Each structure stands twice: as structure tokens, then as C-alpha cells.
């Protein structure tokens, strides 16, 4: 039986396709944010053309620089808004949250849909059983112009997870463990397909898994729907990797590689100056709730640690506020930033200085990712981040939490 990716793309192309073939595909969704959108618009101008083939498919989301971090950022966004008006692009989301969160929340990404997005973490939509691919802004200019792009039909690497996670291990620890075992380029131009335990996980946890698939080189990621048609169930896979969830422990990606993954106990005692909770990886309501509860349990943050919490979307912020989490965090001295990418890309709202050591719930820890190239970033779960925020250093949650 063909893989899920082969079946979905065959339906789009109108004839059977196999992994390795190069085909032109018309997606259901063409997503741009304020970064890739600006690049796409500049490319169209350089080509001397300005046309949008399928405006009804275009989704424009401002998330990288919200609110605008500079005059240049404000001008880029204003130009994109004017472009959207000229071409009758109606799906415009300004200051509503991270693009990948909004795509899922607003139902743009859904079972069997094909999403082309101008961001490398577009595979996050695979959590909603969409087949989602990330492209650069230049490629996305041609998606606007022609309503299609060529792709190579990806092979399928299945990660089958048996058993259950044992607290305090989380989906983030599972995701980092997979990246650590596979390595940064292992799944190059593959669909990383999760089966077993991930099929029973919450949507937020599935988004975390699919989001980090990019860091193993995956072109796309996919979790089968809990209930759905047979054509969206797993088929053939080029490779199957099996993991036991009960063996997963709290881990961190140490500077400066996402795939350099180690148990938290191996780096115990590293002093921390910053903690960032948010991003398209771990900025959802449950992430913030768990972080807040643990921070309260451990009597609040260490006095030498500065904390920024960035909700992944306006809906997340609303729910945080309704549940009383926002006020609790503020009273503990935590900075709450507007929904969006925040300091994840090192542009504003909490960038790191030369000597900062940050525990981040995001997805990348390259030199300069969050500010100074001399800063160090440890990627971790909200649980590990909360313990570090309270202790002022990296501590294995298994040693602290009952």
C-alpha cells in the first residue's frame, strides 16, 4: 500500500506518484508570514510581475516582528497589508500568534490537506494530519504567481513509539530524543511519520513532535488522525524506527546543536540567567500551565533568572488569563510578551546578551539564534524550564519533583 504522502500527493496530481518523483502540486494552503512574505514580495518586484493566482488559498500571518521591532519591520508589514488588499487576499491574521499555531487553530491545516508554507517549521501542521512543506520566500513568490510548486515526493521514515511517557518526561523530551538519535540530516527530504503513542497524544503534543521533525532534516511530518478515512492511515514506509516511551527521560539539547541531546542530569549545575517559554514548539496553554504550576510549587523563580513567557497565540493568552495564569506569572515577576515568535529568532522581546545562558522551550539553539553569538541556549521542555527557573541552574526534574 502506498505511503500516506504518496496517496495524498497522487490525489493532488491526479495520477499515481511514488517517492523520488518530481511533480507539480497545487496546495490547499499557501502560507506566508511577515518575513517570508516580504521576501516573496521583493522577488515578484525583481521579476517585474505582481500577480496572485489563487488569493483564496493565501494565508498571511504576522508573527516574527509583532509588534513591529523597527521602522523597517513596520514598513514591511504595511507593504504586505497593501499587497493583500490589492490582490483581495482575505485570510490575513495580524498579531494573532505564531503562524503554525494559527494554521491549526483556524482550521487551515486539516486531515489530508496540503500546506505550502514560507517557514521551515511548516511541518508542524502534520499534527492535524495535513501534509505540510516548508519553503523559502523566493519559492513562495512562485507559489503566489502560479498557484503551484514542484516538489520531490518524499520518502517515509516512520517512528513507531510503544508504551507511555513516565512523568516528568514530556512530548518535548520524546521529540528531542528522536532528533538526538536520528541526527540533524537523517530524515532529509523525508516525511517523519509518527505512529503508536503519538496517535493518542493531545493536539499540542503532536504539534511539538512534528515541529521538531524539521531539526532531523524532515521535509514534512505526519501523525495519523485519531479517527479518519482509511486513505489517511499509515501505509508503506521506507524505514521504521521503534522507540519505547517509558525509557524517555528529561533531556536538553546543549549548545550549539539541536541534535546534541543529553539527559538533564549530565549537565546538572549549569547556571542559568534566562528562561524563555513559548514558540511554535511549546507556547500552548498546557505548556504555560505546567510551567506556572511547577514554578509555584518550587516557591517562584530564582532572583538571578529573568523569565519571558510568550503565548503561541491570542487564544492561548485569553485562556491563560481566564484561568488566572497570567496574573500568577506577573506576580512572580515573569514578563508576559505579546503572542508571536518573541525572542526565538533573536529580533526583540528578550534577546540574549554575550554572557547569557538561556533555557528555551523553542526549537533552535544555534549561535546567535536568540541574540548574541556568545550566548548559550539549552532546549528543554516546560517542565525542565520551570525547574531551572526556580533553581537558577539546570537540575534534573526527576530529582526535584515528587
Curated annotation (Swiss-Prot):
Keywords in alphabetical order: 4Fe-4S, Amino-acid biosynthesis, Branched-chain amino acid biosynthesis, Iron, Iron-sulfur, Leucine biosynthesis, Lyase, Metal-binding
EC category: lyase
PROSITE patterns given in the database record: ACONITASE_1, ACONITASE_2
Pathway membership: Amino-acid biosynthesis; L-leucine biosynthesis; L-leucine from 3-methyl-2-oxobutanoate: step 2/4
Cystine bridges: none
UniProt cross-references to SUPFAM superfamilies, sorted A to Z: Aconitase iron-sulfur domain
Cofactor needs: [4Fe-4S] cluster
Residue ranges crossing the lipid bilayer per the database entry: none
Sequence similarity: Belongs to the aconitase/IPM isomerase family. LeuC type 2 subfamily.
Role of this protein: Catalyzes the isomerization between 2-isopropylmalate and 3-isopropylmalate, via the formation of 2-isopropylmaleate.
NCBIfam families linked: hacA_fam, IPMI_arch, PRK00402.1
Protein name as catalogued: 3-isopropylmalate dehydratase large subunit 2
Biological source species: Methanopyrus kandleri (strain AV19 / DSM 6324 / JCM 9639 / NBRC 100938)
Amino acid at each position: 500500500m502506498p505511503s500516506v504522502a504518496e496517496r495524498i500527493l497522487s490525489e493532488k496530481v491526479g495520477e499515481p506518484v511514488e517517492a523520488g518523483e518530481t511533480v507539480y502540486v497545487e496546495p490547499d494552503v499557501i502560507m506566508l508570514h511577515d518575513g517570508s512574505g516580504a521576501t516573496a514580495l521583493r522577488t515578484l518586484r525583481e521579476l517585474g510581475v505582481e500577480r496572485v493566482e489563487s488569493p483564496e488559498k493565501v494565508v498571511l500571518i504576522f508573527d516574527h516582528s509583532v509588534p513591529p521591532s523597527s521602522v523597517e519591520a513596520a514598513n514591511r508589514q504595511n507593504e504586505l497589508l497593501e499587497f493583500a488588499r490589492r490582490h483581495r487576499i482575505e485570510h490575513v491574521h495580524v498579531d494573532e500568534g505564531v503562524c503554525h499555531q494559527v494554521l491549526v487553530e483556524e482550521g487551515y491545516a486539516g486531515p489530508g490537506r496540503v500546506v505550502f508554507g514560507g517557514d521551515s517549521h511548516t511541518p508542524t501542521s502534520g499534527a492535524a494530519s495535513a501534509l505540510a512543506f516548508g519553503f523559502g520566500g523566493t519559492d513562495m513568490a512562485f507559489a503566489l504567481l502560479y498557484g503551484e510548486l514542484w516538489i520531490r515526493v518524499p520518502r517515509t521514515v516512520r517512528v513507531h513509539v510503544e508504551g507511555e511517557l513516565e512523568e516528568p518526561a514530556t512530548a518535548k523530551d520524546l521529540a528531542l530524543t528522536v532528533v538526538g538519535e536520528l541526527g540533524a540530516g537523517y530524515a532529509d527530504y523525508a516525511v517523519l511519520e509518527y505512529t503508536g503513542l503519538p496517535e493518542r497524544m493531545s493536539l499540542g503534543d503532536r504539534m511539538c513532535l512534528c515541529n521538531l521533525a524539521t531539526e532531523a532534516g524532515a521535509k514534512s511530518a505526519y501523525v495519523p488522525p485519531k479517527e479518519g478515512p482509511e486513505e489517511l492511515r499509515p501505509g508503506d514506509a521506507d524505514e521504521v524506527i521503534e522507540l519505547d516511551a517509558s525509557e524517555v527521560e528529561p533531556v536538553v539539547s546543549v549548545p550549539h546543536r539541536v541534535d546534541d541531546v543529553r539527559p538533564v542530569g549530565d549537565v546538572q549545575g549549569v547556571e542559568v540567567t534566562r528562561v524563555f517559554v513559548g514558540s511554535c514548539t511549546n507556547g500552548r496553554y498546557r505548556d504555560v500551565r505546567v510551567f506556572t504550576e511547577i514554578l509555584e510549587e518550587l516557591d517562584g523563580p530564582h532572583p538571578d533568572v529573568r523569565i519571558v513567557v510568550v503565548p503561541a497565540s491570542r487564544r492561548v493568552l485569553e485562556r491563560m488569563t481566564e484561568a488566572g495564569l497570567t496574573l500568577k506569572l506577573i506576580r512572580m515577576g515573569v514578563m508576559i510578551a505579546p503572542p508571536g515568535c518573541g525572542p526565538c529568532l533573536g529580533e526583540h522581546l528578550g534577546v540574549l546578551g554575550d554572557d547569557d545562558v538561556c533555557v528555551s522551550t523553542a526549537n533552535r539553539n544555534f549561535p546567535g539564534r536568540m541574540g548574541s553569538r556568545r550566548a548559550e541556549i539549552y532546549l528543554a521542555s516546560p517542565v525542565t524550564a520551570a525547574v531551572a527557573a526556580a533553581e537558577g541552574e539546570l537540575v534534573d526534574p526527576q530529582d526535584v519533583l515528587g
